[in-house]
Curated annotation (Swiss-Prot):
This is 5'-deoxynucleotidase PBPRA2627. Its EC number is 3.1.3.89. Homodimer. Substrate binds at residues 18-19, 33, 69, 77-80, 137. The keyword Transmembrane helix does not apply. Catalyzes the strictly specific dephosphorylation of 2'-deoxyribonucleoside 5'-monophosphates. It comes from Photobacterium profundum (strain SS9).
Length: 194
């Protein structure tokens, strides 16, 4: 039987810190972030289906959220301002991410690669589903900014402004519903939400 290092690599998601150039009150790793993205992506899919006549598979989208940053166990987390500093850097980094996705996929026993490709390989991921995951990813980054700002960390003020613009460009009815229904609670204390 062939040995695989796939899950040993995924177990290292908790070692990859997000926001590496920012001073954080509360650190966040890609394992924690991916779970929150899965929660939010699942909610967005449900909202789309129940409120806006969507036809998505919320469980599938939650899985995509869980796996959306797995390539970072090989690449690390590249800060967004650097990653998108100019189109050439963004294009080259996308190639690095694709190579990392392929490397991870190749670590699986061959009989499972077809099953994991739609979760790991950008070329195989359903584009409509991925839009929801990207929305959730942006929402979770925005929520992190709120958390840090509410803890008195003004380091995240510019990131919050940038993410507000991103949320506007990615706006959909389901995202607006999520923002209006759930986000205000992130500005409250534990006593206030209990």
């Amino acid at each position: 039987m062939e040995k695989s290092h796939f899950f040993a690599h995924l177990a290292r998601m908790n070692l990859i810190q997000r926001w590496p150039l920012m001073r954080s009150v509360s650190t966040e790793n890609i394992s924690e972030h991916s779970l929150q993205v899965a929660f939010v992506a699942h909610a967005l899919a449900l909202i789309k289906n129940k409120k806006f006549d969507g036809n998505t598979n919320p469980e599938r989208i939650a899985l995509l959220g869980m796996f959306h940053d797995t390539s970072e166990v090989l690449t690390g987390d590249m800060p967004t301002p650097i990653k998108y500093y100019n189109p050439a850097i963004a294009e080259e980094y996308k190639k690095i991410e694709l190579a990392a996705e392929q490397k991870l996929l190749s670590m699986l026993p061959e009989e499972f690669q077809e099953d994991y490709a739609p979760l790991l390989d950008s070329h195989c991921i359903n584009k409509d589903d991925y839009v929801i995951v990207k929305q959730a990813d942006s929402l979770c980054a925005y929520l992190k900014c709120l958390e840090e700002l509410n803890a008195g960390n003004h380091e995240f003020a510019q990131a919050k402004k940038r993410l507000e613009k991103t949320l506007q460009t990615r706006s959909t009815p389901e995202m607006e519903y999520f923002l209006n229904t759930f986000v205000e609670s992130f500005n409250l204390t534990l006593d206030e939400i209990s």
